Amino acid sequence: MSNRPIAVVTGGAGFIGSHMVDLLLEKGFSVRVIDNLTGGRESNLAHLKDNPDLTLDTRDIRVLEPDDSLVADAENVYHFAGIGDIVPSIEQPTEYMSANVMGTVCVLECARHAGVRKFVYAASSS
């Protein structure tokens, strides 16, 4: 078991998230990624496949319970998971609301329950 501080990155297999994963590992964090690979790609993390300080969980953020072990003991959460693209959001508003709003609520509840010190939320303008 590592003594490194723990960071959670939602959407960590996406373009922005995977770069955050690289930076956090470089800065000495143990990183737990949750990404259902709907928009992200495992290939974005392929160069890290043998890194013992990286964990990839392919669940949807909407299934996280407040006491989920993924977030337990984490110091920081970087939340990048969500569905982008404007046109499909107009055609499928319920799915977008569920993934983007309720998914964020699930991640926030986990962070609150775990006593996370820093929560960073980022979203694209799409």
Please name every model-derived segment.
Residues 1-126:
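N-terminal Rossmann-like NAD(P)+-binding domain of SDR-like oxidoreductases, especially those catalyzing
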